[in-house]
Amino acid sequence: MYVLEMTKPAQLALLAFTAYVAYFAAGGSLSPTKLGLLAVVSLGSIGGVTALNMVAESDLDAIMRRTSGRPIPSGRLSRREALVGSLILITVGFAAAAIINWLVLLTCLLALVFDIPLYTMLLKRRSPVSILLGGVAGVMPTLGGWATATGSIGLPAFLLALAVFSWIPMHIWFIVYYYIDDYRKAGVPMYPVIASPQSVARATMAFLLVMLASTWSYWLVTGKGLIGNVLMTPITIWASKMILSYPKFMDRTMAKRIFLTANPALLIAFLGAPFSTPHVIACTLLR
């Protein structure tokens, strides 16, 4: 049970959501077999890698007040038990991915490589840009969901993945601001810890522009997602105003508000991704 807690159920649900959205956006059917296998891949691969990440970071978790209650630092689970549980989840997830097709298995392998050895073990304690490698791991469920439906990964899948990738800085950096004393105490050089608030705001804005460009480009390429984009754009503009104001106030409440705005923006954009819009109807009529 504690191993399942280590999968970060809320984060797992969000990443699994991106996988299923990509699956249906790619034209995936309601096949119980594929949908069931994708669920096993999500729980096993995403959840297992997340749990393994907690094993690798258990020393940091013990230092930071925000994470000190997690199963390993709180003593509810030994490091060895957590490691075994994580590896079992990953093995099951990878086996399900291999049953679907080799591309889905590849996305799982890449998620593991980018998340554990590259992000967590190599860069997180050394570099402020470590989340870029973590972000690559974060887009793999989207690519895996698309590959589950089609057996291939094309431009639309990469545009959806780019939206997830460019959403991650707003999601992560403002969590860091909210708990910045924890990160300083643990000696983790996240970008908000070592850079000026103005630099972080500019960088976050650049990524937000990429997110908007990628979701709107997805609509132009596929004719899908217009309603989601129309609803998501004003939320992003509102978030942008808060981000640009943040350096003036450096307020924890505002940091939390920005972080909480990030998730709905991505959710709304992705909810519309599988659905055709008048754009595709107009193109059909003009042919």
PLM feature segments, named:
Residues 56-77, 173-201:
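Cytosolic, membrane-interface loops and tails of multi-pass inner-membrane proteins
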Residues 59, 114-128, 172-178, 240-250:
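C-terminal ends of transmembrane helices
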Residues 78, 240-268:
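Interfacial loop-to-transmembrane junctions
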Residues 79-149:
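Intramembrane alpha-helical segments
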